[in-house]
Amino acid sequence: MKRIDFNYSGKTVIVADGDFPTTELPLECLRKAAHIVACDGAANQLLAHGIMPDWIVGDLDSLPVVIKEKLPERIVYMSEQESNDLSKAFRFTQEKGWDELVILGATGKREDHTLGNLALLSEYARAVKSIMMITDF
């Protein structure tokens, strides 16, 4: 059987505000990321784990004021409520021209968010060169 060797270097990692990764594979993706884009409140989790997001994207309803004040140059505010923060972060990566993506933290916590994020994955896949959604399981 042939082993598939994934190369995570140079990819953009979008971190949603679900369960923060704790296993080696997703954490390796974060370490090797070209860019780390936090979906709103996921910035809290990244910072709590000593990881600085390059960008924080969303409607900012889950982002503490202290982070807004500390990192204003990293924040991309999108007020529209027709899409979730993961979709907003995905659009942001498209505007930047980043087309090799890894999505972390898109499952757990809320079942409705998990199902919505999984449903959007096929839509995203049509617009980029490569995309992976990785969990701890």
Where would I find each of the regions flagged by the language model?
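Alpha-helix C-terminal capping segments
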Residues: L47-I51, Q94-E95, A125-R126
